[in-house]
Each structure stands twice: as C-alpha cells, then as structure tokens.
Amino acid sequence: MTFKPLDPVTKYANDVVKGKILAGNDIILASQRHLDDLERQDTNAFNFHFDVELLHKFLAFAALVPDPDDGVPKPLMPWQIFILGSIIAWRNNKTGGKRFRRAIISIARAQGKTYLASIIAAYDFFVQSYQKSNQDILLSANTTDQTKKLFNYTKATVELMLNST
C-alpha cells in the first residue's frame, strides 16, 4: 500500500521503497517497516501509532537547535528527518511514551551523528522533561573520548539555546 506522503518521514520511506532514493538494505527494511506499521497502527493487535502532529512539533524544535561549531541551526536532510522522526514520533498507544527508547545510528565519520544526538538530547531536556524533576539523559559512545566529545557538544548546544532566550 502506498501512503499519501503527509509527513516527511513517510515521504522518505515511500521514496526509498520505490527506489527513488538509493539506500542500503537496513534503510530499505526500516522504510518498509514504517509503511507496514502505518497500515497496522489502527488495529487492536498493534500497540503503537505514528504521531504526525508530534513529528511536526519536533521538527520545528529541531530547526531551532544550533550547531555549537557556528551557533547556527543546520537544516536537516531527508535521511536525518527519517531517523529522528522514527525515533520521536512512534508512540505507545497506552502510555504515550516512545516506541523506541534506544537507537543505534551508524553513519560514516563527519556526517552529523553528534548533531543528531544533541538534537534528541536537547528535545528530551527542554520538551519531554518539562516540569519533571530528576530527569537523566544518557549519552554514550564507543570510547571515553567520543563520549566526552558528545557530552561537550550537547552541553554547548544546550548553553547556546539557554543563552538565546
């Protein structure tokens, strides 16, 4: 079934599955899963839904997140929107919580993994943890040096956002 691309995540998934966007097998499978799950989301047997309204709110927030290297927000590419939207917009029907609580993002060096992680961390810190106390955000990487880089990058992102208000 082909869905009318109401949102950029579904449009990207459609384009990947149709072969309009060249992608590896894992992205093709993730795109097909997204489309299959959209079909199942209104059935009793499937406990999740794709929240398009939340996706648009998240993308509006992401458009404000500055890159600490120059202090300017970077426009997200369609593949980045697909990854972030898949993580953020799939929700549990009963709890409203995230369907995916962990994500492994494997991208070549210098392609923006740290920026994507900082967007998610900033969103969790500013939006999803709003009016909650004692919230923890876990940042991890393969090495201590990578974890420090991610922490410092995310810290700089949050500081830029706090100082811009």
Predicted regions and their residues:
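Phosphate/NTP-binding elements of NTP-utilizing enzymes
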Residues: 2-165
